Design a protein with these regions (language model features):
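Composition-driven recognition of glycine/serine/threonine/acidic- and proline-rich low-complexity segments
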Residues: 2-27, 31-202
Length: 202
C-alpha cells in the first residue's frame, strides 16, 4: 500500500487530471450560484507535505475562513475549502451586496452564505471525482471555522501529505484565489488509484 510520497508520475498525473476537472466543475457551480460569469485559471495540483501546504495557503498564523467536509463510503478523508478574504468578499458582494474588511465583521447571514458556497464547491468537486472513478462517496454536513490557517489545517489533517488544488477565479476582470485541499486516507488513496486503473500495485 502506497503513501502519498511513493506515488508514481502517472499516478500523480491522474490525480492532477481529477483536480483540474473537479475545479472546473466547482467554478461552474460558483458561477451559477453567484449569477456571474466565473472562470478559473489552469489549476495547479500538487502533493504537498503538511508544513508546505500551510505555507502554500498563506502561513500558519494568517487568519482565514474554512469550510470542511468529511468523506465516507468507499472513500474516507476530508476536503477543505480555504476562503481568503478576497474570495469571501466576492461571494458576499454577489449574494448579499456587502463586503467585510476582516472576518470579525461577519455575522450569521454572511457565514451561512460562505458555508453554502464552500459546500457546493466541495460537493461538485467530489461528484466529479466519484463520477470518474465510479465510487460512492458520502459527505457530512459542512463545518465552518475562522481561525489561524495552521489550526484549520491541523483540524482536518488525515496524513502528513495533502493534495492541494490552487488557481485563481476570474470574475469581472478580478482574480481571487481558489484554495482547495483534498486528503483521502491512505487506504482510500490506494483504492481510488486502483479504480482509476493507474495503481501499479507496488
Amino acid at each position: 500500500m502506497k503513501n502519498y510520497d511513493e506515488l508514481s508520475s502517472m499516478e500523480i498525473d491522474t490525480l492532477r487530471e481529477i483536480g483540474s476537472i473537479g475545479t472546473g466543475n466547482a467554478a461552474t457551480a460558483l458561477s451559477q450560484m453567484l449569477g456571474r460569469e466565473v472562470n478559473i485559471t489552469l489549476p495547479q495540483v500538487r502533493i504537498m507535505g503538511y508544513n508546505e501546504a500551510i505555507d502554500w495557503i498563506g502561513g500558519p498564523e494568517a487568519i482565514t475562513a474554512g469550510v470542511l467536509v468529511k468523506m465516507s463510503g468507499e472513500i474516507s478523508g476530508i476536503m477543505l475549502s480555504v476562503q481568503p478574504l478576497e474570495f469571501a468578499n466576492l461571494v458576499l458582494e454577489s449574494i448579499l451586496g456587502l463586503s467585510a474588511k476582516d472576518y470579525s465583521e461577519l455575522e450569521s447571514m454572511e457565514t451561512s452564505a460562505l458555508v453554502e458556497v464552500g459546500n457546493i464547491m466541495i460537493s461538485t468537486f467530489i461528484n466529479a471525482l466519484a463520477g470518474l472513478s465510479g465510487l460512492t462517496v458520502d459527505l457530512t454536513v459542512p463545518a465552518f471555522t475562522i481561525d489561524m490557517q495552521g489550526a484549520i489545517l491541523a483540524f482536518g489533517s488525515q496524513s502528513d501529505y495533502i493534495m492541494t488544488i490552487g488557481g485563481d477565479f476570474i470574475c469581472d476582470n478580478k482574480q481571487v484565489p481558489c484554495r482547495l485541499l483534498l486528503s483521502p486516507d491512505i487506504r482510500s488513496l490506494n483504492f481510488l488509484l486502483r479504480k482509476l486503473g493507474v495503481d501499479s500495485g507496488e
